[in-house]
Amino acid sequence: MAASQTIADSKRAFHQAFPHVIAPLYRRLADELLVELHLLSHQSRFEANELFSVGLCTVFDTFIKGYRPEAQTDALFRALCSSNGFDAAKLRKTYASLVEQAKGKDPESLKDWLSSHALKEGSHYSRLMAVGLMSLLKAAAADATDSDTEAIVKQSKELAEGLGLPTDRVEKDLTLFGSNSERMDQAVELVEETIAAEKRKKERRLEEQAQRTSS
């Protein structure tokens, strides 16, 4: 990506790649990720490593739940990535591969495996890396009793330093991610309930009209 590209340029490229109306509930997600990826793409010390790939996909998938039409979500992700010089297909491939590899690993082997994906010394940290770490820990603990969010955040913090991640920021970023995820789930549930209620009202009106017509 050209160093001279501005946020306005990135937004223009995004809207060209994704010329669809985005519902207000999801517009903020798109705007925030677009700006975040733009800033990272201009950070000379940033490297789109494995933890970043997993984290970006996790954040997008978490906050895109309930998006309609669902068929547009892949195109939305591709547009967010391509408008900032990232390869969506490569990110998705890395995400799927690492999540699959993490499954079933015991704590010790997981720690050794994660060390091979540590942030290089002097590299720029992104909150998406913390989310990526948490996502892999969740995949490994899928069948364990301690797979709740608090335990995962604690485990992420314990592993952070050994992976070159700032411990305090990891805890803060994951706590914020968790609270935002809960709020998004509640918002999506409310929207779906509202849509369902409107659908029921419409069906009742149609039934009443049909009864009046037949009587």
From Swiss-Prot:
Keywords: Coiled coil. Signal peptide: none annotated. PANTHER family: PROTEIN THYLAKOID FORMATION 1, CHLOROPLASTIC. The keyword Endoplasmic reticulum does not apply. May be involved in photosynthetic membrane biogenesis. It comes from the Bacteria. GO terms for cellular component: plasma membrane-derived thylakoid photosystem II. GO terms for biological process: photosystem II assembly. InterPro entries: Thf1. Residues 182-213 form a coiled coil. The gene is thf1. This is Protein Thf1. Belongs to the THF1 family.
